[in-house]
Amino acid sequence: MTTLDTLLRDKVLLLDGGMGTQIFARSPTLEDYGGAALEGCVDLLTERRPQWIREIHESYFKAGADAVETNTFGANPLVLGEFGLSDRAYALNVQAASLAREVARSFDRPRFVIGSVGPGTKLLTLGHVGYAELLASYRVQMDGLLDGGADAILIETCQDLGQIKVAVRAAREAMAAKRRRVPLWVQATVETTGTLLVGSDIAAVLTSVEPLGIDVLGLNCATGPDEMHAHLQTLSEASPFRISCLPNAGLPVNVDGQVVYPLHPAAFAPKVLHAASEFGLAIVGGCCGTTPDHIEALAAGVEKLNPPKRTPKLERSAASLYQSVALRQEPAPLIVGERTNANGSKKFRDLLAAED
C-alpha cells in the first residue's frame, strides 16, 4: 500500500494549486453562500455547492497533482463564528475531507487528501485571542479532518509563532485521542518584508518548531517563487524536516481594478522546478493565482526530478519572536590537555621518565 511517506521517499510530491482562485472564478453569488450574512464564507460552499468543490479537486488531480487540500482554510469555530456558524465547524471539516477522499478514490493511482488548516483571523501574539480558546477552536477542526479521512494535516499560511504552536498541539491531541497518527506539515508565509506578519524571520520559525516533531516545514503564499529563494536556502541548509514550497503566481498587480497574478503557467513552472532542484524541495504546488494549468505545467517537470537529498546542519539555537540566536560561544573555550600534567597523572609521569 502506497502511503504519503513512501511516495515522498520515491519522488517530489505535487500538491494542488489555489482553491480560492478556482472558487472565485465561478463568481459565487449571495444565493450560493446562502444569503448576505454568509457572503465570503468560502468554507460553507463545501455544503452549499459541493459540486464546485468536487470539480476543483478533480481538475487538480487530472492536471497531475498527487494530493489536494480540503476546502477548510477557515473552517474552525473562531472564524466560522464571524458568520454565526461556530457549531458547524466539525461537520464542515468532516464533509470537506470526505468529499476530497471520495474524489481521490475515483482515480487509478494513489491520490491523497491534505487537511487544510489556515491561520484564522485572530493573532495569539497580539492578544486577539487567548491560548485556551484558540486551542479549543483548532481541536474541533483537527477532529473533523481526521474523522473525514485526511491523510495529513497542513497548518498553512502561518503568520504567528504562537499560532503555529497551538495548532500543532491541537493536532497532536486529536491524533492521540483517536489513536491515529498522520503526517503534520507546517507552512509559514514570509511577506515581502522578509518576515512573517508579526516580524519573525524564517530562522526563528525553524528554531521554534524544531522541537515539535513535525514532518514538513515550508513556505506558501504572499510572494512568487523568486522572492522565496533566500528563505528556502535557509531551510535547505538547516532544516531537518522535508521542505515544501507553494508560491503564488507572482506578486499581485492591479489591472483595471482587478487583482491579477502575473506568472502564467509557462513562466511559473520553471521557477518552481528550479527551486525544487536547487534547494532539495520535497513538495511543490501553488497558492493564490495558480490554476490546474499551473499544476499541469509543474507535473511535466516534477516527474523528471529525483527525490531530494540534503545534508542539513541544524545549529542549536534559541529564538525570540523575531530572530534566532545560535548557542555558540565566541571566542570558543581554550581546550587544555590537563591529563598531560606530571603532577596530576602518574601514568603520564612514568611515560616522561621512560622518555616514551
Regions found by a protein language model. Name each.
Residues M1-D356:
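Domain-level signal for soluble alpha/beta catalytic cores
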